[in-house]
Every structure is written in C-alpha cells, then in structure tokens.
Amino acid sequence: MNCLTVPGVHPGSPGRPRGQIQVIFGPMFSGKSTELMRRVRRFQLAQYRCLLVKYAKDTRYCTTGVSTHDRNTMEARPACALQDVYQEALGSAVIGIDEGQFFPDIVEFCEKMANTGKTVIVAALDGTFQRKAFGSILNLVPLAESVVKLNAVCMECYREASYTKRLGAEREVEVIGGADKYHSVCRACYFQKRPQQLGSENKENVPMGVKQLDMPASRKIFAS
C-alpha cells in the first residue's frame, strides 16, 4: 500500500456528498502531523473549507496551531474534546484532527461527521509507550475508508521504527513531550534499556516472560 495515497472522494460535491474517514497512524517522529497538514493543504488549494483541530494541552511548539517537530506550523483550533468544535465542523467540508488519541470522543465525532458528508483526516499514535492501544483510537479502524501506519527511524540504531519508547520513569499514559521524553525505536531497541533506565523504576520496556532481578521495595501505581 502506498501510504501517501488519498482516496479520490470529493466532499461537498454538487451531487450527493460522500463522507469518509482517513487515519494516519505511527509512532512519534514518523511524520504523522506532516502528512496530516499535507492532506489538508491539498484540499485548501482546491478551495474546500477546512478545519484543523489540535489537542489544547499540547503546547510544546505552538499554542494556536499544529506544529511538526521541525517547527512547520498550520493554524488550528485548540480543543480538549471534539464536541467543542462541533458547530465549526458542520460548516467545513474537510476536518483534520492532530493527536487524535487524546480526544475521548474521537470515534463518535468522526463517524458522525463522515455520515454528514465530511472528509475527516486523523493523525494519531496507535499505541502507548507500553505498546497497548491508545484510548479508543483503534476503534476507528473498522469505520475508516483509509488507514495507514507510518514508520519512523529508530533513534538508537537507525533502522525502521514502529514503536514509541519513553525515556523517563513516568507511569501515566498521557505525558506530552518530544525527543526529551520519547524515542522512536525498532523492536530490538524497544527492549534495550538505556543507561538512565537501568534502575528499577521503569519496567515498561521489558518483554513478557523475562524475570526481573531488581525488585523495588515499593512502587507508586498510576491508573492507565
């Protein structure tokens, strides 16, 4: 599958409007936001009314727009829940959503908008740093017309990277950060501890079935 192929459906056409959901998955640093912005700009050039939504708590690079890790930006509407932009979305033909995994109503919103004839493009992490499903985002897969998963470059060995590895000891699922907190990694490097992770506080990257020799006396548990 060509990961850059966009289905040729024209939202808001004079005949019957045909909605669709496009999903762009991948680990951190795989170019998800870059691809989302490329697709939205493509529709803007064709004079479609577009709405780009960003997660309001992600203020790493820009507070008023979507930003890639290399600081390319695009104006966006910040929100913590997609219902907050419902009316604006109804007035748009194309809706782009960045960091879709953080929105609790992502599945319901996308399905509702697609059923009203909108093209909805979602960029999201498919998995957490523990390689578990991120919220309800994977429930979009059976509803979507187009699903792609981009790979990054492993930041530890430079091979293809499909996973996101947390560098710190935080246990919460939602910890927003860049290269200071996360690496994109391949399968082998996901299980390889970095020097600062050799202590006993971070065991998320240990493969199942491997016995732990360093057992802490106590450990704070976070709900995830």
UniProtKB/Swiss-Prot annotation:
Looking up Pfam families in the UniProt record yields: TK
Q: At what positions is Phosphoserine found?
A: 13
Q: Where are the transmembrane segments?
A: none
What broad class describes the main subcellular location of this protein?
A: cytoplasm
Per UniProt, Zn(2+) binds at 154, 157, 186, 189
| One cellular component term from this protein's GO annotations in UniProt | cytoplasm
Cite the EC number: 2.7.1.21
Output the superkingdom of the source species: Eukaryota
Q: Name one GO biological process term.
A: protein homotetramerization
**Residues given in the record as substrate binding sites:** 129, 173-177, 182
Record's subcellular location: Cytoplasm
> Where is the motif KEN box annotated in this sequence?
203-205
Q: Which reaction does it catalyse?
A: thymidine + ATP = dTMP + ADP + H(+)
The top EC class, named as a word, is: transferase
- Is Metal-binding there in the keyword field? yes
Binding of ATP: at which residues? 26-33, 58-60, 98-101
Q: How is it modified after translation?
A: Phosphorylated on Ser-13 in mitosis. Phosphorylation of Ser-13 by CDK1 during mitosis reduces homotetramerization and catalytic efficiency when DNA replication is complete and intracellular TK1 is still present at a high level.
Could you tell me the keywords of this UniProt record?
ATP-binding, Cytoplasm, DNA synthesis, Kinase, Metal-binding, Nucleotide-binding, Phosphoprotein, Transferase, Ubl conjugation, Zinc
Catalytic center at which residues? Answer: 99 (proton acceptor)
Q: Name one GO molecular function term.
A: identical protein binding
In the record's own words, the domains note is: KEN box sequence located in the C-terminal region is required for its mitotic degradation by the APC/C-FZR1 ubiquitin ligase and interaction capability with FZR1.
Q: What does this chain do?
A: Cell-cycle-regulated enzyme of importance in nucleotide metabolism. Catalyzes the first enzymatic step in the salvage pathway converting thymidine into thymidine monophosphate. Transcriptional regulation limits expression to the S phase of the cell cycle and transient expression coincides with the oscillation in the intracellular dTTP concentration.
Q: What else is known?
A: Two forms have been identified in animal cells, one in cytosol and one in mitochondria. Activity of the cytosolic enzyme is high in proliferating cells and peaks during the S-phase of the cell cycle; it is very low in resting cells.
Give the quaternary structure: Homotetramer. Tetramerization from dimerization is induced by ATP and increases catalytic efficiency due to a high affinity for thymidine. Tetramerization is inhibited by phosphorylation at Ser-13. Interacts (via the KEN box) with FZR1.
What family name appears in the similarity comment? Belongs to the thymidine kinase family.
Q: What is this protein called?
A: Thymidine kinase, cytosolic
